[in-house]
């Protein structure tokens, strides 16, 4: 029977069947300071060791300051998390990239750029956006703290097989439309729970045309559609991206790896539980208006009314979202003022994102009413951006250029908003209070965020691109 990409990766990692569940082997385990302390504590209490420290890599990202390299810059609680991670990694001989290390970065940015993630792998992390790594044709998903402990101890995980979903994005992307617009449009179409219980495979001409960094953006937000994971089949772009990276295979091992990677595709006639079709030509620059990523519209579309939704749950959700966001049905996004802009995160903190935002930023100055920060996703991204002069473009335009970290994506460090603030953000979640209690978050692409910084409102980025 014809197999999907998901079938192939899943079946290659089954160790044993436990009733209806499978015990699968984990190839790569990424850890950070927030979800690992309790896991290591459990390990130590039971007198266990980390089974495969060589397959485990740690970084500091969530709780760190983007203003200072001091480990205690975000207060004693955050400092304790960071110190605990360092202690645990040292005791268990795990490679750690701490604050200030040249390879440190957001876990889902530094992992790929080091070549730690490769096609056909199983990848887990105590973080919901682990799906990012599916861009390489890896089965990657977030896990809870108890599961982190289990993987540390056994390098395995008990899992039930998910359903499969194929999402085809047909045709070429129009000028000015980005990977962020693709994934927001997908979530807008199927809903923020539309892929619950599924692993998504993204395909179609528009997806094949994306760079590896753009594919990471798409896969990153699979969880916002409710999915377990998101995948893109590896191709020549994947191989070119990985070749020569620090942890990628070398010599004959590389040749053997590529030969295997080329078998990782969905075979003709393979069956999916669900198939979704989108036309790339229909996608406009996207902006979320509500409090979940599925509440999203094109930048020139009026804010919807609750009556526009037939589902009673969606209707009630719209009522609450409009109230929280301080919006009225029929309003134009171009009339809505923004006072904060955040460019960064594991969704859009890579070098191509920095370049896209800088292209818009150089066309103006940050509006007097706006505070705008740019946070590179890793030390490598920061150095590359500075080598290209992007930092100067940003600072000359009035943006703040920060140190790498998760930053304003979540209210877990010192980059927070206050009640009533309205932020154009390149992150992945617009939940109530995500960026600070009472703060209002609108998800957009890096270019759209830069345009919002300049205009002080939501503007169609296509008007600001050459």
Curated annotation (Swiss-Prot):
Its cofactor is [4Fe-4S] cluster. Keywords: 4Fe-4S, Amino-acid biosynthesis, Branched-chain amino acid biosynthesis, Iron, Iron-sulfur, Leucine biosynthesis, Lyase, Metal-binding. Binds 1 [4Fe-4S] cluster per subunit. It holds the Pfam family Aconitase. Disulfide bonds: none annotated. It catalyses: (2R,3S)-3-isopropylmalate = (2S)-2-isopropylmalate. One of its GO terms (biological process) is L-leucine biosynthetic process. Transmembrane segments: none annotated. [4Fe-4S] cluster binds at residues 346, 406, 409. Its EC number is 4.2.1.33. One of its GO terms (molecular function) is 3-isopropylmalate dehydratase activity. Pathway: Amino-acid biosynthesis; L-leucine biosynthesis; L-leucine from 3-methyl-2-oxobutanoate: step 2/4. The keyword Membrane does not apply. Heterodimer of LeuC and LeuD. Belongs to the aconitase/IPM isomerase family. LeuC type 1 subfamily. Catalyzes the isomerization between 2-isopropylmalate and 3-isopropylmalate, via the formation of 2-isopropylmaleate. NCBIfam families: leuC, PRK05478.1, PRK12466.1. This is 3-isopropylmalate dehydratase large subunit. The lineage of its organism: Bacteria, Pseudomonadati, Pseudomonadota, Gammaproteobacteria, Alteromonadales.
């Amino acid at each position: 029977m014809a197999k999907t990409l998901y079938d192939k990766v899943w079946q290659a990692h089954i160790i044993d069947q436990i009733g209806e569940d499978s015990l699968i082997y984990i190839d790569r385990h990424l850890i950070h300071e927030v979800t690992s302390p309790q896991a290591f504590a459990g390990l130590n209490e039971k007198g266990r060791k980390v089974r495969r420290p060589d397959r485990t890599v740690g970084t500091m990202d969530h709780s760190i300051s983007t203003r200072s390299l001091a480990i205690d810059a975000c207060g004693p609680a955050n400092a304790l998390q960071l110190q605990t991670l360092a202690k645990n990694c040292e005791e268990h001989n795990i490679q750690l990239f701490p604050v200030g290390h040249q390879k440190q970065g957001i876990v889902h940015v530094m992992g790929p750029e080091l070549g730690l993630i490769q096609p056909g792998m199983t990848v887990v992390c105590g973080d919901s956006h682990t799906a990012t790594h599916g861009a390489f044709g890896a089965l990657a998903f977030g896990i809870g703290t108890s599961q982190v402990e289990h993987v540390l101890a056994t390098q395995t995980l008990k899992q039930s097989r998910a359903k499969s979903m194929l999402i085809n994005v047909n045709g070429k992307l129009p000028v000015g439309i980005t990977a962020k617009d693709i994934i927001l449009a997908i979530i807008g179409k199927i809903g923020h729970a539309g892929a619950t219980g599924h692993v998504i495979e993204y395909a179609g001409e528009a997806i094949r045309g994306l760079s590896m960094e753009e594919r990471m953006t798409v896969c990153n937000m699979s969880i916002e559609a409710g999915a377990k994971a998101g995948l893109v089949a590896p191709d020549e772009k994947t191989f070119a991206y990985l070749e020569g990276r620090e942890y990628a295979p070398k010599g004959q091992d590389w040749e053997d790896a590529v030969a295997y990677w080329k078998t990782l595709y969905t075979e003709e006639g393979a069956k999916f539980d669900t198939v979704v079709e989108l036309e790339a030509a229909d996608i406009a620059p996207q902006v979320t208006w509500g409090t979940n990523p599925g509440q999203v519209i094109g930048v020139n579309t009026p804010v919807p009314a609750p009556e526009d939704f037939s589902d009673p749950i969606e209707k009630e959700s719209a009522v609450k979202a409009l109230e929280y966001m301080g919006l009225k049905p029929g309003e134009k996004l171009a009339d809505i003022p923004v006072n904060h802009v955040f460019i960064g995160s594991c969704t859009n903190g890579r070098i191509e994102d920095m370049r896209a935002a800088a292209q818009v930023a150089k066309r103006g100055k940050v509006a007097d009413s706006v505070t705008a920060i740019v946070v590179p996703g890793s030390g490598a991204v920061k150095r590359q951006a500075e080598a290209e002069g992007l930092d100067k473009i940003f600072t000359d335009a009035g943006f703040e250029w920060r140190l790498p970290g998760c930053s304003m994506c979540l209210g877990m460090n010192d980059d927070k908003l206050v009640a009533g603030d309205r932020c154009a953000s390149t992150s992945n979640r617009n939940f109530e209070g995500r960026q600070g209690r009472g703060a209002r978050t609108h998800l957009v692409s890096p270019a759209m965020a830069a345009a919002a910084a300049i205009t002080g409102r939501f503007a169609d980025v296509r008007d600001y691109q050459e």
